[in-house]
Structure formats: C-alpha cells, structure tokens
C-alpha cells in the first residue's frame, strides 16, 4: 500500500520551471501537487477496480458454464432432451441461459419437475455478485439462431453444440 507521499514523489511533475515547488514531506503541498496526487491515486484506484471487475466476470462466466452443464445433465435425467443452451451476458454478475426443447417436451409434464429443480438451483447458486437464470423455449422446425442473437443469446454451451 503506497502512502500519499510516495504517490507525490513518484507521480507529480513540477508545475512551473521557474518556481521551486514545496518538496513532499515539507509543511504543505501546492494545489497542483494535491490535484496531481489525486489524479494519480484515482488512476491507480480505477485500474484496481477494473482488474477486480474483470477477474469477477471471468470467474462468473466460468461458473455460468459449469452451472449450465449441471442443469443440462439434470434435464436429461428428467427425460428431457435439450437442443441448445444459449447464454446472454447481462452484466459482469448477471447471466441468462435460454434452453430450447422439442415442442412435445416443452408441453410435457416432465418440464414441471425441471422448473422446480431450476428454481431451487438458481436460488442456491445466487450470491451477492453472481446471478444465473434459466428460460425454456420450444422449437418446432429448428432454432433461428439469428433471432436468438438479436435477443442477445449469442454463446452456445459446448455440451449441446453439434
């Protein structure tokens, strides 16, 4: 952790060549030194926050894939045959998955058990910085991928890619 005087010594340039600015650690700092120290600290803070968001997104993205795999396997245990699972990234912490099923299975009572399982699964997986939700959609004559992409579902899960 750097001290304010470390920031000032390493990050502040003299305001004017003709004037001797107070040196860090003396009785006071010039306005320009304070502004420069603020900017330097702010830039370091933004970089740290960006790195933390990127790390959290990467972890959540990985987890959403793993969790979707678990749901697909459970749906198959219920006797359902998902055709595709498409991901939409809403934010760094929120993900939505659209699972397509044959129309006959979408109307089958087995889907009720799947909805119960998925609801419990979503609640158990949710944390302060991770939210995954699932939707189901019937398909009759295949999936119009262009329409799904226009709705933001652009990433296919590998378990169901043919």
Region roles according to the model:
Residues 5-37, 126-162:
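Catalytic "initiation/cleavage/transfer" segments centered on a nucleophilic residue
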Residues 74-77, 81, 100-103, 120-124:
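Amphipathic alpha-helical interaction surfaces
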Residues 75-96:
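Short edge beta-strands and adjacent turn/loop segments
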Residues 107-131:
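Short, non-transmembrane amphipathic alpha-helical segments
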